């Protein structure tokens, strides 16, 4: 359903921000420092306002396991390569957050003691309570699970109020807005309607996790400066998926 209401949504205290790795590359292989710095600045502004922010980043700017599998590579091995790509993105974001005066911890699902903490949900919650940003790397630590699913699972385990899905479009549309000028933007929609309309919000496993556990999903455009703060503060941007 769409809505014309201008009433603000609830603001959120603890959020999970899911970032696509492709965004970190600026459309290329590797890391675009200008993009990462811009994202870090936006996250830092929100963290300094008192919100608690956890982050999951994809690794698509380095490797995409499913695509490598299509070229004949073993799926599990290619997924592990993708997990390593996510860690590189995590370390880059950690560094830029530090430049903006925000303490940050990286936790990985694969043991990398020299560069990150292991994933420990209770420790992650303590970091958040102390005002630190926590970035989760290496996906779930197992092949066949996407970083969308990681974001949903981590959000549930550490008690986030909402899963913020940062995209390169304004939200969830009735059709692809890049090819259909009549595509309608949904401002609010229920999980049931998402399924009935065959809309793409997150991968099926991540969406099911959120739907089954009543975790709201807010899909919004990361490319609009200040949108992370707007999403956290409850301004009416993007598409809110909730029952």
From Swiss-Prot:
Binding sites annotated in the UniProt record for ATP: 18-21, 60, 64, 173, 176
GO molecular function: ATP binding; UMP kinase activity
Coiled-coil region(s): none
Organism superkingdom: Bacteria
Pathway the protein acts in: Pyrimidine metabolism; CTP biosynthesis via de novo pathway; UDP from UMP (UMPK route): step 1/1
Keywords on record: ATP-binding, Cytoplasm, Kinase, Nucleotide-binding, Pyrimidine biosynthesis, Transferase
Record has Cytoplasm as a keyword: yes
SUPFAM superfamilies in alphabetical order: Carbamate kinase-like
Positions annotated to bind UMP: 59, 79, 140-147
UniProt keyword annotation of DNA-binding present: no
GO cellular component, one term: cytoplasm
Broad class of the protein's primary localization: cytoplasm
Free-text activity regulation comment from the record: Inhibited by UTP.
Catalytically driven reaction(s): UMP + ATP = UDP + ADP
Subcellular location: Cytoplasm
Top EC class for this record: transferase
Cited Pfam families: AA_kinase (PF00696)
EC number: 2.7.4.22
Sequence similarity: Belongs to the UMP kinase family.
Role played: Catalyzes the reversible phosphorylation of UMP to UDP.
Self-association and partners: Homohexamer.
Name of the featured protein: Uridylate kinase
Organism: Corynebacterium efficiens (strain DSM 44549 / YS-314 / AJ 12310 / JCM 11189 / NBRC 100395)
